[in-house]
Amino acid sequence: MSAASRRTLLGICLVVGGSFTVLASFNYVLTPMLTDLDLSQSQASLALSIPPIASLLVVFLAGGLGDRRGHRTVMLWMSVAFIVGSLIVSIAQGLLAVVIGLLIEGIAATAIQIIGIGLLSDRFSEPRARAAAFGTFGMVSPFVWLCLPVLTGWIVGEASWRWVPLMWATIGAVMLVATLALLPRPTSTRPVGEVATPILAGATVAAAVQWLNRVGDEGLLAPISLASLVATLALGAICTVLVRRLPSPAFSLAPLRVGRARSLLAVVVIIPLINTVFLMTMAFQYLYGLTVLQTALVMVPAQAAAVLGTRLIAAPMMRRIGVTQTASVLFAVLSVAMLSVFFVTPTSPLWVPILYVTIYNLLTVAASITVTSAVLTSAPDVNSGQLSAYRGSAQSLGAVLAVVVMNGAVFTLGRLFMSSELQANGLTQEEAAAEAAQIQASATSPDVMSQYAVPLPSGVETSQVMADSIATGLHVNGVLGALLALACVFLVRVGRRQSLSA
């Protein structure tokens, strides 16, 4: 790899890595921020759902802008926007300013990630250099998640929460300098062209995500769910009509016409669907009574393993056996590893779930970066910006499906198990249902288990039944995750066959 290539890779890692910082640290600043601004949890949940949805509006526009106006130029604009959004949050006196700041920052971060991955694919096309570049780039996200939660927890514990968005703004300044100093200037630029179709495509994805959210919260036939579905279909129809009628639309459905691209994008959707890290963080708090900061600390081995895994496992494997075989092997091993969740029980020592989530994170992140590399070469006639945008949209859909499908399945089966166990220990069906509903409504703090130490008629404590139901939920996630990992193996192999037969 030449000095210029190394400089470009460093710049991409710094700028894209900086864009992850808000997402990696925001949960740790949320509680003190709500207290300071005198906001309710419901207000915050409603308002803070807007920025990630709105960020999807620019996902396809960003891919096109990078290819037309130059990756460096657009990343420069977005770094400035990232700083502005962070500063607005730091001086916010109410919810509106927080939402506006996070909205600007979220749009900027989304655009930077889409454009940065597209630039990475364009600059590193030779297989060995590409494997090394993507292996290095794959270290960035887990490294940010390794450092930022602990750093944010320390800042919030020692000073005002407003220092955290000031930290984001400082990181944004580093991103700005890295863009100017390290990324190559565009050799040519083209007019932006029409922007209606990429914005409508992003709006369609955003509406679809909102529909899935509403289905999860309100139910499939709730009026707001049906309204979201109608909006999704209407936006999709308008976008399709414009794509067909405009002489040169900026948005294209070309990636979806390529079999290998479709298969790999399906894998991108499935990866976040497994959602084991989120469920394990809940288990650390409710099974082991850890605080949020303690949970961040016990997750350090998992993030450190992911950092090393992409560089020391994924990159060498991609060089030696190719992207497809690497992804297949990693997902196959992940499928087996997911079944080790049965070693995680209410009585298992803390190191058991730490080891489990560490192995999971290592394999998942290594497989993810391998699939990302494959997606960006899955449709040779489509530019990397569009493919990167499709990947970002697929990832967003997967994250929402994780809440609607995986969390729904885990929590539903966990509640059924808990209700059954409560009845088995002496409660009537009505009493068990009422107790389960009360527990669900109050389960908002790490010490919730101690609130239910009252023995049941059988003599077993309610907290023990709760612990067993949480462990059952983890086991459900492990089995479903193993099946989803096998589905990824199948889709990767199908995509390979479609590529060879094309």
Predicted features, each with a name:
Residues 5-22, 26-34, 41-48, 85, ...:
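12-transmembrane solute porter fold
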Residues 81-88, 171-178, 234-238, 333-340, ...:
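Transmembrane-helix signature of multi-pass solute transporters
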Residues 395-494, 502:
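Hydrophobic transmembrane architecture of multi-pass small-molecule transporters
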Residues 53-57, 87, 142-147, 202, ...:
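Hydrophobic/small/kink-forming positions within alpha-helical transmembrane segments
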Residues 36-37, 42, 67-68, 90-93, ...:
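Membrane-helix boundary and inter-helical linker elements of multi-pass secondary transporters
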Residues 89, 179, 213, 239-243, ...:
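Structural signal for membrane-spanning alpha-helices in multi-pass inner-membrane proteins
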Residues 135, 153-267:
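Hydrophobic transmembrane-helix bundles of small-molecule transporters
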Residues 52, 56-197:
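Helix-loop-helix hairpins in multi-pass membrane proteins, especially solute transporters
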